[in-house]
Amino acid sequence: MEPIKRYIESVTNGNLWIYVLSLGKEREVIEAETTKLIFEKFGFLPNELMIKTVLFRLKNDGYLSRERFKSQKAFKTTEKGLKELEAMKSYSSNLIQKL
């Protein structure tokens, strides 16, 4: 695999939590729409099973809250999740400056 393809894979499908936390930072997100929203906003189509796994882990660890929206399972990023997202942004920004 070419280096750029490996890099793109690692920062997209390899780090789905970043995209999930970002989606839920401003509003409730219906879980069933997560894959579609990631595709629309970030331009790649993640694996549905991986999305479910990431949602489960982020909820259990307190980074996402369990919500209901239009009678469907939904989530919203918690304060803990927002702090983690900001830490990731800061780290990425510092790394890009060094590159």
Report each predicted region and the residues it spans.
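Beta-hairpin "wing" of winged helix-turn-helix
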Residues: 59-70, 76
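Short alpha-helical segments that sit at the start of domains
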Residues: 1-27
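Amphipathic alpha-helical dimerization/coiled-coil segments
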Residues: 83-99
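Short acidic, hydrophobic short linear motifs in intrinsically disordered regions
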Residues: 28-39
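Short amphipathic alpha-helical interaction segments
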Residues: 44-60
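Basic, amphipathic "hinge/linker" alpha-helix immediately C-terminal to the N-terminal HTH DNA-binding motif
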Residues: 71-88
